[in-house]
Amino acid sequence: MAMRELSQLNRDSDGDEEVWVKHYSSNHQILLVGEGDFSFSHSLATLFGSASNICASSLDSYDVVVRKYKKARSNLKTLKRLGALLLHGVDATTLHFHPDLRYRRFDRVIFNFPHAGFHGRESDSSLIRKHRELVFGFFNGASRLLRANGEVHVSHKNKAPFSEWNLEELASRCFLVLIQRVAFEKNNYPGYENKRGDGRRCDQPFLLGECSTFKFRFSRVAKELYAEKVRSREVKERESMYPEAILNKQPVSFDHRYRLQTEFEAIAGTITLGKSKILWLSQEKGHLHWIFVTTKNVDVYSSKIPVFLICTLESRQRDIACFVKTFQFKLVKNHYPNTLTAGVEFLVKFITGKYEECQQVTYLRKNFSGYGDGNKQRIVLKMDMSDEKSMKKAMKIASAKPGVRSVSIQGQNDQLVLLGEGIDLAELTRELKKKVCMTTIITVQAAPPQQPPQPHPMGQYNQMPPARRCTCEIPNSGFCGFCRSMSQPNYQVVPSPYYPPMLYCRDETDGCRIL
């Protein structure tokens, strides 16, 4: 009864019994790593009344375990009877490669008092390094075996030299964040005996002293921040090693399966530097050239000429986008989604590598002869729109994007057709996927030119002819039962194998037969 008093019983509405032992529930899938005589897992299983949710593992084989520890055989027998999964020869640093663990996910992964072995004094830097390598390997493997909201628990001593292991720093390198640190009390787990596990006194307990249980949880935000940090470091290294090759490097080609709207086409312009210098911006064979020209007699018609850079360089052409990325963060996109524009002073500093920070940014309209009505687009997006509400929402999102002139639904209510120019397709697709449903790009092409209205064949007043009964009622022929005069060739009726009825009729010049 004393053991039962230590557990908390929670009964849900279905009558099933959930047993809590400190931080662990009978409904949790629990993995225990580095078990000595399996007394900790035996304690949990006894309090739960079942071990079907427990997977207990040890580094030693079964024969070594029962030879080292006196109570190991009885503990293993009890765990097996209660339904536990017992694994031997499991390396704590390669959990995610173990064939019995790599495809399983757990709510709690527990490692009590990790230790790399007694190979000297605990204060030796070499031994501390071995301990840290062991714990880091465990964190790396355990973080890959967690369920959503799963936790990694490590019980550890608080005082030096054990505090020099710095568990929080090791966990952060595996994108695990500390969510709680609670005192470890051995009395909460009746029957648990901590063992030295190595040497002649392997079955003897060691002094615990002041200990804590560190609870860690996987953080996707930490992983994304680390990836961004690595990318920025690589960009800085590339800039420092090859400062001149960044602007003149050939853009990387990608097979997008559709034509990008933001390629280097017809990009040309001038930027005035004072009164005599001009920076000429031009495009040739995929390269973007910056040329300084010195002249005295220059007709400077404006101090700010609309020069722009393509914003999709950041996502489509990584190798030359390192400058553009900085440029994009400092200079927010204007109302034209496919371009970034800036004042002359800002752009010159940026191009010449002297850019630090510019407080005033002037937004300019792009005004090149190469970009006009000839850049209209027709975009077809395939969407899984199941109801009318999702259709309306998709059309509302698309119509609000800059550059979109018309939006329509075609096909079996699964194709969103857009007409316009300068549409930011990547941003639109991303927003539709997030707010409506899965979206796939089918085609991106130039919109066909608008045809002038054709005069109706019925004449100036477009009069409706009188209704007439005709014989052109062939399925899928495009004619209706009471057809109007259409500029089509004479229709050939396939003769019937049966003898036709006697009909009196006359043929009209427009191809209809009047009964």
Swiss-Prot record:
Disulfide bonds: none annotated. The keyword Lipoprotein applies. One of its GO terms (cellular component) is cytoplasm. One of its GO terms (molecular function) is metal ion binding. It comes from the Eukaryota. Pfam families: BMT5-like. The modification Cysteine methyl ester is found at residue 512. GO terms for biological process: rRNA base methylation. Heavy-metal-binding protein. This is Heavy metal-associated isoprenylated plant protein 41.
